[in-house]
Amino acid sequence: MISYLKKAEKTPQTETATAQKVVTEMLAEIQARGKDAVRQYAKQLDGWSGDIVLTPDQIREQTKDVPAGVRADIDFAIRQVTDFALAQRESLKEFSVELHPGVTAGQRVLPVNVVGCYAPAGRYAHIASAYMGVATAKAAGVKTVVACSSPFRGQGIHPHVLYAFQAAGADVIMALGGVQAIASMAYGLFTGKPADVVVGPGNKFVAEAKRSLYGQVGIDVFAGPSEVAVIADETADPAIVASDLVGQAEHGHESPAWLFTTSRDLADRVMALVPELIAKLPPTARDAATAAWRDYGEVILCGTREEVVEISDRYASEHLEVHTADLDWWLANLTCYGSLFLGEETTVAFGDKTSGPNHVLPTKGAARYSGGLSVHKFMKTLTWQQMTREATRQIGQVTARISRLEGMEAHARTADDRMAKYFPNASFEMGTPVEV
C-alpha cells in the first residue's frame, strides 16, 4: 500500500504563459534588429555594455587570477566528462549490410557542425554547466562550439565559468545571458554561424526560448526545476538521505525532493532531520531549500519494493538515488529516471559536478520517454543505400506496384523507366497505372 507521509502543497509551475509572451516579443525584436537588440537586452537585463565576443587576450586577462587548485579541479572534471562522452561516442557504430542480393545499405555517424552551449549565472556560478556542454560537444567532434554565459553580477562572465569554457574547448565565448544568448547562438549573430543544436540549463525564459526555437535548431531537453528522488530501505543512513534531499532542494524554490521508502522509521527520522540541515545553510541556499521542501517535498511510504518501483517510474525523477540492499535488483527493475545513482557512496552532487555522465537531464516526467544530454545529441545517424542493376528486377517491380496502390504514379514511373532501360526485352508486373 502506498501512502503519503508528506505531500507537496504545490505543483511546480513555470508561469508558461508569461514566459511565452516575453520570449515571443524578445525573439521578434532580435530577428528584426539583430545585434542592436541583443546589446540593448544585455544592458537592460544584465547591466552589461561591454564586449560580447571575448578575444583570446581578454580571456587570458580575465582568468589569470583563477587559482591553480581551481584550475586543477575543473581540469579533472573535464577529463571525467570527456572520457565518458568518448566512450558513448564509441558505442555509435557505422556499418553496411547486404539486405538483398545487390542491395547494400548502411549508416554513417557524423557530428553536427555548430553547437551553442549555455551556462546560466544567477544565484550561483554554474561552473559545471560550462564544461558539461562544451566538453561533450567536443568529444562528439563538433567543429565549432559557441559558449555563452550571463555577465555575473554585471562584471562579465564569472572567471571560473570562463576558465571552464576555455579549458573544455569552446571556440567562441560570448558574454550573453538569457533569451538574447539563446537567440544569438541560434541565429548566428556575432559569429556568422547559426547553431545546429543549442544546449544548456537556464531559467523559465531560457527554457521557453529553446522551446520556441526548436525545429529551427535542435535542443537538449525541455528543462524545468531540478528534481531528486531517493529510494531508501531500512539499511539506509537517515542523515545521508536527508543531506542528499537538502543538497538538491537548494537549487531553487520550485525544486522537488522526494523520498520513496519501505521503512516508516527511516521516513520519520529523515523528516525530522531535513529542517535541521536546511537551517544550517547559508542564507541564499537556506531560502531556496526551505521553500522547496515546504512546498514540493514529499515522503511516500510503500509496502513493498515493487510498489517503490511503481511510484518511482511514475514520477520519473531527473535524479534518482538508491540507498538499499541488493542494488543490482534496483538497477534491473527501475526504468524511468534521468540519471541513476546507486548506493550511498554515489550522491547526485558527484554527478552534477565531477563523476562523468552529463548533468543536463529531463525533468517534469520527461524521463519516461527521453534521456539526458549525451554525445548522441551532437551526432547525426545518416543512412545510405546502393544497389546493382540486377537488384532492381525485384526492387523495381515491388516499388512500382506499391506506389500504384498508393496512387503515386510518378513514383512508380521512376521504377518503370529504370526497368525499361536496364532490361529492354524483359516483361515485368509493374501494377495497374493510375488513371490520368
Curated annotation (Swiss-Prot):
Optimum pH is 9-10. It catalyses: (2R)-3-sulfopropanediol + 2 NAD(+) + H2O = (2R)-3-sulfolactate + 2 NADH + 3 H(+). GO terms for molecular function: histidinol dehydrogenase activity; NAD binding; zinc ion binding. NAD(+) binds at Y118, Q180, N203. Binds 1 zinc ion per subunit. Pfam families: Histidinol_dh (PF00815). The active site is at E318, H319. It is an enzyme of class 1 (oxidoreductase). GO terms for cellular component: cytosol. Keywords: Metal-binding, NAD, Oxidoreductase, Plasmid, Zinc. Its cofactor is Zn(2+). GO terms for biological process: L-histidine biosynthetic process. Zn(2+) binds at Q248, H251, D352, H411. The keyword Oxidoreductase applies. Transmembrane segments: none annotated. The keyword DNA-binding does not apply. Catalyzes the NAD-dependent oxidation of (R)-2,3-dihydroxypropane-1-sulfonate to (R)-3-sulfolactate. Belongs to the histidinol dehydrogenase family. HpsN subfamily. This is Sulfopropanediol 3-dehydrogenase. The gene is hpsN.
